[in-house]
Design a protein with these regions (language model features):
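Selective transmembrane helix interface/packing segments
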Residues: 2-358
């Protein structure tokens, strides 16, 4: 277990960067290394989100609905992302009459950066993480929950009834599903015995079943598939994708909390949505799929990690294309009467199993 932890954890990225800088390991060198590390990780996530996310969304949706999708601009239609960016950023930023301007301006920033900051403690590969605090899992859920504040701000500050309804729906939905999400994560903590993200990954490094030619790793998706399925459903509800896109619901409340946003602010909200989807995929990969663990040397762990995130993302897009939207009352009832009860049952069952094993 110790060797696995050393292989998967490594030194945080800023510590490695400090060794390459001429400033030494003093306050200046540490600060510069932290900024460079954050820029590298942030750029990786923003690139995957801004370019690959929307393009893959269109392609996957087209495949499920027997259409061609984007195929005109550039190879495989990749240049459409640049065209979309130019189109959106060149539009006029229209401020709705009667808007609470400070809150209205701040909401898109909160939505985007609350997700981006969550990647700081995710171990993406050998040494590819900004920090590794002992309460890393608590940090991820705490920082991601700030998005609820951004949704309320966007809905309230827009001075629009549809925006306000979208914000209220978002809060009701997050309250109904963040509690089950956390309870399911606690069951993983009981198995791993730690809230530290790198140790949760390392705890899954041992083989669960050795069949000689092939060994099944002790990923918690195999150890506790019930919790894995529950977490995927709760995460789908948390990020607000079909069939749980109640805060937007175009056929009911126009575009929900983002109705009055345009230009660069709409881009930030759009990026924030994709960042939260990818952050959810990163958390699922870390808690249930062994993080960056996979066949081959530890140096290609980042490749396996991104592949697992994309697997979760493709499932999200499949759900968006295949499943109809639920009503708000159905969604809340499933959250409080279904997911909460099942997550509590999973937690009790996990505690009993861990107690017997111990």
């Amino acid at each position: 277990m110790a060797s696995a932890l050393a292989t998967l954890q490594g030194a945080p990225l800023p510590d490695r960067i400090v060794e390459l800088l001429p400033f030494g390991s003093g306050p200046l060198g540490t600060a510069i290394a932290a900024v460079i590390g954050a820029t590298i990780v942030g750029s990786l996530m923003m690139t995957m989100t801004a370019i690959a996310g929307p393009w893959a969304k269109r392609k996957v949706t087209a495949a499920f609905t027997d259409r061609y999708a984007v195929n005109r601009l550039g190879p495989f239609g990749l240049v459409i992302i640049v065209a979309d960016a130019v189109r959106l950023l060149s539009k006029e930023l229209i401020v709705p009459e009667g808007a609470d301007r400070p809150a209205w301006d701040l909401a898109p920033i909160v939505l985007a950066f609350s997700a981006l900051l969550g990647f700081a403690v995710i171990p993406m590969g050998s040494g590819i993480h900004l920090a590794d605090p002992e309460v890393g899992l608590v940090y991820v859920f705490a920082i991601a929950s700030i998005a609820s504040l951004g949704l309320v701000m966007a809905g309230y500050a827009s001075n629009n009834k549809f925006s306000m309804l979208g914000g209220l729906r978002a809060v009701a939905q997050n309250l109904a599903y963040e509690i089950p999400l956390i309870l399911i994560a606690v069951s993983v903590v009981l198995f791993a015995g730690s809230l530290q993200m790198s140790e949760i990954v390392a705890a899954q490094a041992e083989p669960l079943l050795d069949l000689g030619v092939v060994s099944i790793p002790a990923w918690y998706a195999f150890v506790n598939p019930f919790a894995f399925v529950l977490f995927i459903i709760a995460n789908l509800m948390e990020v607000g994708r079909n069939p749980f896109d109640i805060p937007e619901a175009p056929t009911e409340i126009v575009a929900g909390y983002q109705t009055e946003y345009s230009s660069v602010y709409f881009v930030l909200i759009y990026l924030g949505e994709f960042l939260h989807i990818f952050l959810g995929g990163a958390v699922i990969a870390t808690l249930f799929l062994g993080g960056p663990a996979g066949p081959g040397p530890a140096s290609i762990g980042i490749v396996w990690f991104i592949a697992k995130i994309w697997a979760v993302y493709l499932f999200t897009q499949w759900a968006r294309s295949a499943l109809p939207r639920l009503r708000i009352d159905q969604l809340i009832e499933i959250g409080w009467k279904g997911m909460l009860v099942l997550s509590l049952a999973n937690l009790v069952l996990t505690a009993v199993i861990v107690g017997v094993i111990a």
